[in-house]
From Swiss-Prot:
NCBIfam families: PRK02201.1-1, yidC_oxa1_cterm. The chain crosses the membrane at residues 39-59, 112-132, 148-168, 219-239, 245-265, 272-292, 322-342, 343-363. It is found in: Cell membrane. It comes from the Bacteria. This is Membrane protein insertase YidC.
Length: 383
């Protein structure tokens, strides 16, 4: 009777009892599981190293290979578009303006390096047909660049689909990190003035114990950064090299090929319209980085530290976060306006995704609490 009573309690506690029982019966061999785990870690390291090398290549390529340098002027520098005569539209057909060195990139080739060939060129081939098919022909009115907005939105959607797994994993790790932020701040405050090796070792042990208890993988918090930086470099090069984007005058006032900060400083009396561009893009960038932190703080109010030293450490951490937010917010000012447009649209995607994640986590917690209460009631009744 006691055995049956215990079995009923166990089954009542787990709302997914059938799935859990099936999983136990079909347990994978431990040695095979361990081997697969090592293989997966090795593959991830290879991918991260590959992305790091590609990112460094993208950053330094223009210094060693001048034929890959972009130029804001149409028909100057390296450009991606259609072969001359294919469309009959100067905004899409690659041709030199005879002002400076010119290099065309209409067909796939490795002569411009693996970064441009493997990443930038394929990305441009996604948006080029969209740009061309939704354009306003030269003889039928003014093109306000709405096709450019549409093309970047579609590219953003594809990027989000590709990186959604990494983003969600990083978000969940960040969420767990937020839940223990108070405890970590307490440990940092506890060993703030410690200089001996033993104290530093004890601090590391205590922190790792909290991470292990709450299933936090510190490395996972940096994974999104490893992916975000190469993506940014790809988009930056793509919008800088794609001829129709360089030719876009957004809403008839903002040239997407020029840098807002440079235009404002060079002649503010003529280029004052770029001030409004900056005032639109920069605040949106700040909000998109602040809102996820704000929602995480609201969700984890009970995880805050209570000691004075812990609060001081927490304030220091948040100060660093705000510095990073403002540093990243300056990027749209010092890069071409097309990059600023991408960051603006990307910020909207980030806010929407963060809100959906926030609602999902809140509802999941409420559901977990409801199940826990139900288990307590069932266990009391069985007792």
């Amino acid at each position: 009777m006691n055995k049956v009573h215990s079995e009923i309690k166990t089954q009542s506690f787990n709302p997914f009892w059938n799935a859990a029982t099936l999983k136990e019966k079909s347990r994978i061999d431990p040695n095979l599981k361990k081997a697969l785990s090592y293989l997966w870690k090795f593959l991830k390291i290879c991918v991260f190293l590959f992305l790091t090398v590609i990112g460094l290549w993208g950053c330094t390529q223009t210094y060693s290979e001048p034929w890959t340098v972009s130029n804001p002027r149409i028909g100057v520098g390296l450009e991606i578009g259609y072969n001359y005569g294919v469309t009959g539209d100067y905004r899409y057909d690659l041709t030199s303006s005879n002002i400076g060195p010119y290099f065309s990139f209409a067909n796939y080739q490795l002569s411009y390096g693996p970064f441009l060939a493997w990443f930038v060129w394929p990305a441009s081939q996604i948006i080029l047909p969209i740009l061309y098919q939704t354009r306003v022909p030269l003889t039928q009115g003014i093109d306000y660049g709405l096709n450019t907005i549409l093309a970047i939105l579609i590219l953003l959607f594809i990027i989000r689909l590709i990186t959604i797994g990494i983003t969600l994993n990083s978000t969940l790790n960040t969420e767990r990190m937020g839940e223990v932020q108070g405890k970590i701040a307490e440990i940092n405050a506890k060993y703030k003035n410690a200089t001996d090796t033993q104290s530093k070792k004890m601090k590391q042990i205590e922190v790792m114990h909290i991470y292990k208890k709450h299933k936090i993988k510190p490395a996972a918090l940096f994974v999104q950064g490893f992916v975000t930086i190469p993506i940014f470099l790809i988009v930056y090069k793509m919008v800088s090299l794609t001829r129709p984007i360089k030719a876009t005058i957004l809403f008839g006032i903002w040239d997407l090929s020029v840098t807002p900060g440079t235009e404002i400083i060079s002649d503010i009396s003529r280029n004052w319209v770029y001030i409004f561009f900056v005032l639109l893009v920069v605040p949106m960038q700040i909000v998109s980085q602040w809102l996820p932190q704000f929602w995480a703080t609201r969700r984890n109010r009970n995880a805050k530290t209570t000691s004075q030293k812990g609060l001081e450490q927490l304030k220091k951490t948040r100060r660093i976060q705000w510095i990073l937010i403002f540093v990243f917010a300056l990027f749209p000012v010092i890069t071409p306006s097309a990059v600023g447009l991408y960051w603006f649209l990307n910020s909207i995607f980030t806010i929407l995704q963060s809100y959906i994640t926030h609602v999902f986590i809140v509802k999941r917690r409420q559901r977990t609490k409801t199940i826990s209460r139900l288990d307590q009631i069932l266990n009391r009744e069985l007792d």
